[in-house]
Structures are given as C-alpha cells and as structure tokens.
C-alpha cells in the first residue's frame, strides 16, 4: 500500500510517500523559519499562505523522486489536527481534492501520533509496549503506548510546553528565532552550576510538568544582571542558558525514568523537536542504560514536523483498522484534539 502524507499544521510544509512493503519512498519538506524570523514567531496567516504556495510543488517532487504517478497512490493521509486552523485547512483541502479526483481513501492523522510513531520509521525500531516522551513547541506529554491507536496519557504540562519554554527563554536572552536551537547552542559554552534554577514539579509525585516558573526564574536573572546587551554579557548569558537547559533536562529525564519504572516499561521513545536536543539524548541514554532501558529516537530530520511521519502514521492506522478511512470528502480539521480521542478499538 502506497500512502501519500501531507503535513501543514504549523510552519513546515511536508509531503512524503510511504510504502507498507518497501518503506519510505520519498519525502520533501519546506520550512518557513526564514519568513517568520523577522516577526520573532509564527504568523498564522503568513504560514497558511505559504503552505498554499509550497504543497503542490512538493507533491510533484516526491512523485518524481519515487518514480510514481498520482494514480499509483493507494491512500492519502493528512494532518487533521492539532495545529493552526488555517494551516491545517490547506493540507486538508489538498488531500481531499486529490482523494476526490483520484477516487482514493483518506485518513486524517493526529499530528502528535505522527511524532509518537516516527521512531518506528527507523531500522532499529521499538516493539510495543513502550513509554513515549513527546516534547515539542506546543506539547510535553508522557504516554503509554500499547499499540497503534492504544495511547494512555500519564502526564502533561500544566502551562508552558518544554519547547515553548525554550523559545521564550531565547527571547529573554536576546537570541534569534527559532529559539530552541539557539538556546541549546549557547548552552554548549556555558559553565555548569554558574546559576541555580528551579526544577519545577520534580518531586510532585505525578508525571505532570510545569515550565512557566522556570521561564520566570530566567527573567529574574536577566533583569538582575542586565544580561540582554553588550559583549561583556556573553559568558553570563551562556551560563544562564546552560542552567536553563540543565533544569529542563533534569525534569524530563527524572519523570520519564520514573514513569518507565512504575509502569514496567523497558523501552522509551522520545519524539518532537526538543527530542533533538543533544543533552537530553545523552542523559536519557546514560541514565536509561544504567537501568536496563532502551531509548529510541527518530532520525534528526524527522524530529521536527514532516510529511514522512504523517504518511507512516496513516499507513499504520489503516493497517490496524481499515475502518479508519474517512467517510466522504470534506474540509473539517480539529485544531484542538486530544491524542486519547483517536483510540482504535481492539477486536
């Protein structure tokens, strides 16, 4: 089964072809980072308009790379939510128009399910069940994954997501957009222990997160030391960035390992943009290894939003339950959507 995947939930336009027999056949991605940089963040209207410009050329690129025609597509998967409503509608419109014109079935994919299953694209893929840590700009969640469509939420952020905290801290430190990679790069030059920042909810007794207070603690230090200007501030800024990253990583690692232990899970999947962070990967690998745990990640190119994960997730859902096919053609999207709402009933 050859599945076309279309991703347009935020500021990346992704298109891919996944073959259930041959694996990933082709994928193409266009990032809008340069366009949004001048605004310091994603402008929804601009994002939607750019998706319109990019999606069809990307579709033609992946068809050419795979050496197939539109008629060879067996099914079409698209990101139905969550995300920016206007951006989602672009991908949904293209998918539904193609499906109608070609007479192909469609499946609306949950964006987070795409991230969660993306490590299964790798040759060294985890078996079910596993614990998933989803860390991105909009979400920070711990999920128990028993099968495709079998997800149990164990904990989530009560305020800022980890990626959001990275972006806001980047602004406080006078760094560019996107903030997450900028903070991580600066932290590489920081001295550990130069600043002491809180580890919110580290000992809360549950698996929820909170990062708003950490951002406020960074703001307090920035104002106290006037770290937002001048070359003389470079080392203190790097030290503060290091303290921030250390605090985030400490909380994510501690809660992830405790969740794995309490739920008897030996495999951990880390997905989402923050999952590309070097410190997080190194700490989880080291601490997990001491406890006999295996940690799996998607390839770095698939940590951020992409069409490959949507094509793959759509294919997996159709294989798990052919009844997942969308009834008719339409343009409905779900900007706010809980992952547990897409549960596949077991026979």
Curated annotation (Swiss-Prot):
Primary enzyme class: transferase
Lineage in the entry? Bacteria, Pseudomonadati, Pseudomonadota, Betaproteobacteria, Burkholderiales
Instruction: Write out the similarity annotation.
Output: Belongs to the KAE1 / TsaD family.
Q: Which GO terms describe its molecular function?
A: iron ion binding; N(6)-L-threonylcarbamoyladenine synthase activity
- Which cofactors, by name? Fe(2+)
- Which named protein is this? tRNA N6-adenosine threonylcarbamoyltransferase
Compartments, as annotated in UniProt: Cytoplasm
Q: Which residues bind Fe cation?
A: 111, 115, 305
Q: Which reaction does it catalyse?
A: L-threonylcarbamoyladenylate + adenosine(37) in tRNA = N(6)-L-threonylcarbamoyladenosine(37) in tRNA + AMP + H(+)
> Is Iron one of the keywords?
yes
Please tell me where substrate binds in this chain.
Answer: 134-138, 167, 180, 277
- Identify the gene encoding this protein: tsaD
Determine the domain of life of the protein's source. Bacteria
A Pfam family found in this protein is TsaD
């Amino acid at each position: 089964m050859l599945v076309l995947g279309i991703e347009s939930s935020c500021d990346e336009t992704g298109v891919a072809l996944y073959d259930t027999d041959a694996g990933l056949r082709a994928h193409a991605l266009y990032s809008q980072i340069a366009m949004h940089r001048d605004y310091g963040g994603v402008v929804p209207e601009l994002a939607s308009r750019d998706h319109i410009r990019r999606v069809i050329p990307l579709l033609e690129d992946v068809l050419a790379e795979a050496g197939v025609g539109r008629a060879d597509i067996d099914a079409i998967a698209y990101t139905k939510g969550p995300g920016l409503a206007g951006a989602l509608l672009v991908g949904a419109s293209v998918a539904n128009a193609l499906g109608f014109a070609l007479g192909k079935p469609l499946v609306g994919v949950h964006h987070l399910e795409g991230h969660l299953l993306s490590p299964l694209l790798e040759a060294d893929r985890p078996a079910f069940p596993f614990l998933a840590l989803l860390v991105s700009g909009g979400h920070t969640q711990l999920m128990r994954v028993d099968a495709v469509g079998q997800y149990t939420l164990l904990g989530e952020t009560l305020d800022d997501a980890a990626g959001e905290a990275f972006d806001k801290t980047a602004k406080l430190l006078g760094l560019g957009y996107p903030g997450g990679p900028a903070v991580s790069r600066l932290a590489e030059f920081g001295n550990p222990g130069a600043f002491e920042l809180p580890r919110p909810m580290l000992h809360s007794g549950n698996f929820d997160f909170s990062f708003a207070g950490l951002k406020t603690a960074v703001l307090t230090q920035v104002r106290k030391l006037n770290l937002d200007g001048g070359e003389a501030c470079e080392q203190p800024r790097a030290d503060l960035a290091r303290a921030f990253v250390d605090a985030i990583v400490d909380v994510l690692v501690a809660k992830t390992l405790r969740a794995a232990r309490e739920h008897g899970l030996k495999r951990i999947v880390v997905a989402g943009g923050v999952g590309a962070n070097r410190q997080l990967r190194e700490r989880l690998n080291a601490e997990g290894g001491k406890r006999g745990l295996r940690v799996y990640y998607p390839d770095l190119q698939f940590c951020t939003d992409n069409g490959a994960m949507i094509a793959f997730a759509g294919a997996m859902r159709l294989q798990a339950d052919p009844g997942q096919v969308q009834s008719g053609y339409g343009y409905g999207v779900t900007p706010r959507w809980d992952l547990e709402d897409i549960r596949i009933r077991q026979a």
